[in-house]
């Protein structure tokens, strides 16, 4: 019996020793693979990427005009190259022509929006007494209906409802009285020069970027070896394709939003359908806000004044636009920029949370830049766990 126990103990010890040796060999093997991966070059690349992300996190919020100008210049550069290739004119002339067309388009669009907004704002001010009358009438009808329902309710519940309604109205009245309308208007007017300066900086930076992009590219390539230059060429061509695909996809989604909004508003409010569809189309570019910021207050106002039909239709339209934006956008983006819908959605969300609204664009671009660098061999991730 003792001999059998000794044999079993020896067998267990041998098995445990064999298992420990296998685990040790596995750990050592994987350690060598990780050590081969973390070369000096790889470590410098990782440090550079981290420093770039940290710098972007602090610099991007205060340099949005310059970033927007650079992105716009990248978008307009193919038009400049095509014009220069077909007409055989100098690049300076081609840049001037494309820039002029772009500025004229922006100016005409801004003029149309401003005139329509002023016209509609004037009409709202002129009709404000009627709107106030409608709100008062709707409030009186609400009180009358509430009093009729009070008759069948317990006195304690009626008292609680009265207290709640009174407190709500008191809070609403105090919030309205606390708002200094003149101060808000003054603050808005005083901020206009700042916006104008930002817009001028954007236009000047756009023109200079369009002129200097080839020179900046040559300057960058002068610091690179031939092998690295080929990799960067592949990466930049891939990024150019992705940037164009991104804005093409965004434009396609916005066209769908504009068409659906215009068709819906032609049935709901035909007198302002075109203007409101255009405004909603512009605002829908902002991902965290979207069309709901226009349609929801409009619908609530219509419900308050008693126009339940119009208010309900506006809410339905807002829900339809939200569904279209959340379902169509990742698929279209993934098709045109080479990312899966899930990866596109994750990149957009993380970019939005880290960098704000501009991160909606930067998030997918960073993912594409990383995958392009990996495909070009600039970043090598060939280890397995």
UniProtKB/Swiss-Prot annotation:
InterPro entries: AI-2E-like, YtvI-like. Coiled coil: none annotated. It is a multi-pass membrane protein. One of its GO terms (cellular component) is plasma membrane. It is found in: Cell membrane. Belongs to the autoinducer-2 exporter (AI-2E) (TC 2.A.86) family. This is Putative transport protein BpOF4_00890. It comes from Alkalihalophilus pseudofirmus (strain ATCC BAA-2126 / JCM 17055 / OF4) (Bacillus pseudofirmus).
